Amino acid sequence: MRERLDPVDPAHLRPAFKTVLRHLQRGKALEEMVFVQGHDLLALDGTGYFSSKAIACDSCLEKHHRNGTITYSHQMLGAALIHPDKREVIALMPEPIVKPDGTEKNDCERNAAKRFATKFRQDHPPLKVMVTEESLSSNAPHMETLQAHNMRYLLGVKEGDHAFLFEQVAQAEHAGRVTYYDRDDHNANVHHRFRFVSNLPLN
């Protein structure tokens, strides 16, 4: 199977993903996936699916180690429509993260996200989505890409990666500009406390 699939350009799979989503839209299946204010929740995350120190191709990403060895890998930016109350997800066409033809420089998740956003809007121009991603995606250039493609976003942040932002939150809290929301999850016996604050600089 791998020998058959390896030479196939992933772009040839794009029409299949597009057709599946179109059929789901026509069948009203996406109506159950609406998350908030008419927007579907679109999860994006980079992942690796091949790694080897012995097997490589021209498209492999390369990681050079201090001991002189090289790890070759293939990665992709995975995408799926999700809903917190649903077990089912709707997979969308992933974007490969591979070394471009004729270059020595590795590709990266940020560049893959730019390509994904462009292709997504070409395939699904009217679909309202809210992108959710991990802390590594919480940077101004990526947010500008999402905004340019009419995508809302809900991005995670970590204190270690966004120290300045957390300082701003602490100052806003001290000034009384933070709104709190408490919620009990009785099934898990957990109490949640959320803090909301707007109009803070990211960095």
Residue ranges and their predicted role:
Residues A56-S59, E144-A148, Q168-A170:
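Short, glycine/charged-enriched secondary-structure capping and boundary segments
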Residues T103-F164:
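Domain-level cores of phosphate- or acyl-group-handling catalytic modules
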Residues M1-R4, T19, E173, R195-V197:
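A short glycine/small-residue-enriched secondary-structure motif
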Residues M1, G38-Y49, A79, A113, ...:
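Short, conserved catalytic/metal-binding motifs centered on acidic residues
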Residues E159-N203:
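An anionic, glycine-rich sequence signature occurring as long contiguous blocks
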Residues R4-K86:
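Active-site-proximal, Lys/Arg-enriched surface segment
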Residues F17, K114-A117, V169-A170:
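A generic alpha-helix structural signal
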Residues H64-L127:
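Electropositive, glycine- and tryptophan-enriched low-complexity nucleic-acid-binding patches
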